[in-house]
């Protein structure tokens, strides 16, 4: 009888073990610090959005989301580090239109594939660039006045960028191509040092992401000539678009999104996406983003993936037309 009872107990135990659902990697995620790599220096637009969302994720999950700035090569250095990281959800990338839509067409050699080597997590925001000038160096207050001033002195005026191949750089190249003006390109390792030199008068013009320059524009240190989106920005409603200023069709907006290494468990990606969307639905964060020109899109991972694919195709045409290439 005792043997029968033991056998029955053993059978029930095995049955219970078989019926128990397998543990998901997301069940205990995160259990330690998560690193968010920003592939540009601190102080730029990518860094601003990363810190906003990193703070929210830390509060939601109870573990710090630490920002790790790794600038260089138009964002490729930091992006490559994430592409090669363990796909466990503890190393994330705050990617951009540059790292995931432009660079694959611009650079002759890439160490990662923006589609194959990453798992899309969540879209953060899209922003226009500001065509801004040092008010002491440049007299122009409109796009047409700037074109006239630049054509009067070919190659005298310079434009700064956050690095070769960034949307900030290509905005300038598009402007040169569509207007025929000759400007000297001065690349920097990130937006922050470029803006500092623009304010100091070391360079004359920049097509910077709106968030990293808007306070300098509002404070009078820089003069906004126009924005690069097709519609005016709610953050600077009185500043016209380049398209409405005599260059119809001009559109060079930037965007920012979170990516994980490819093969990161879908459950972890879904968990991160859910918390990001929850944070982006908060009116307080929405206002913060709107104040710096950020337009939120509540994309699911598959929607972000489709968006990135379309952006790669769009910017490939822009890069080809511009003739820009980086070895």
Can you describe what each PLM-predicted range is?
Residues 31-33, 178-179, 218, 241, ...:
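An extracytoplasmic/periplasmic, membrane-proximal ligand-sensing/linker region
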Residues 24-26, 117-121, 243-249:
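Short beta-strand/turn micro-motifs at beta-sheet edges
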Residues 94-99, 161, 191, 208-213, ...:
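Beta->alpha turn/N-cap motifs
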Residues 84-90, 105-193, 242, 255-288:
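Hinge/capping helix and adjacent helix->loop/strand transition within the periplasmic-binding protein
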Residues 22-116, 156, 180-205, 216, ...:
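N-terminal (or domain-start) structured segment
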Residues 100-109, 169, 174-178, 205-239:
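A ligand-binding cleft/hinge motif common to bilobed small-molecule-binding domains
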Residues 126, 212-281, 310-313:
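C-terminal lobe and pocket-closing loops
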Residues 1-31, 326-327:
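Short, low-complexity disordered leader/linker segments with a strong preference
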């Amino acid at each position: 009888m005792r043997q029968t009872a033991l056998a029955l107990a053993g059978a029930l135990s095995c049955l219970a073990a078989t019926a128990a659902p397998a543990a998901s990697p997301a069940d205990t995620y995160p259990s330690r610090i998560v690193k968010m790599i920003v592939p540009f220096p601190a102080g730029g637009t990518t860094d601003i959005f990363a810190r906003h969302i990193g703070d929210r994720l830390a509060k939601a999950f109870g573990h710090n989301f630490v920002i790790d700035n790794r600038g260089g090569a138009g964002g490729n250095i930091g992006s490559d580090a994430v592409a090669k990281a363990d796909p466990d959800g503890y190393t994330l990338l705050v990617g951009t239109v540059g790292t995931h839509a432009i660079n694959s067409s611009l650079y002759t050699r890439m160490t990662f594939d923006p589609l194959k080597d990453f798992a899309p997590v969540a879209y953060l925001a899209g922003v226009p660039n500001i065509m801004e000038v040092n008010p002491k160096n440049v007299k122009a207050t409109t796009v047409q006045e700037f074109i006239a001033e630049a054509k009067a002195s070919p190659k005298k005026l310079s434009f700064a960028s956050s690095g070769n191949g960034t949307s900030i750089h290509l905005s300038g190249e598009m402007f040169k191509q569509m207007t025929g003006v000759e400007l000297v390109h001065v690349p920097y390792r990130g937006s922050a040092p470029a803006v500092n030199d623009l304010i100091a008068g070391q360079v004359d013009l920049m097509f910077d992401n709106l968030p990293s320059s808007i306070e300098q524009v509002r404070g009078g240190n820089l003069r906004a000539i126009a924005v690069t989106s097709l519609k005016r920005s709610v953050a600077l409603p009185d500043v016209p678009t380049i398209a409405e200023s005599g260059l119809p069709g001009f559109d060079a907006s930037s965007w920012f999104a979170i990516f994980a290494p490819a093969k990161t468990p879908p459950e972890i990606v879904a968990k991160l996406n859910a918390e990001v969307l929850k944070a982006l639905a908060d009116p307080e964060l929405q206002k913060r983003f709107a104040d710096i020109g950020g337009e939120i899109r509540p994309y699911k991972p598959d929607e972000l993936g489709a968006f990135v694919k379309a952006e790669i195709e769009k910017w490939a045409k822009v890069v080809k037309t511009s003739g820009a290439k980086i070895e």
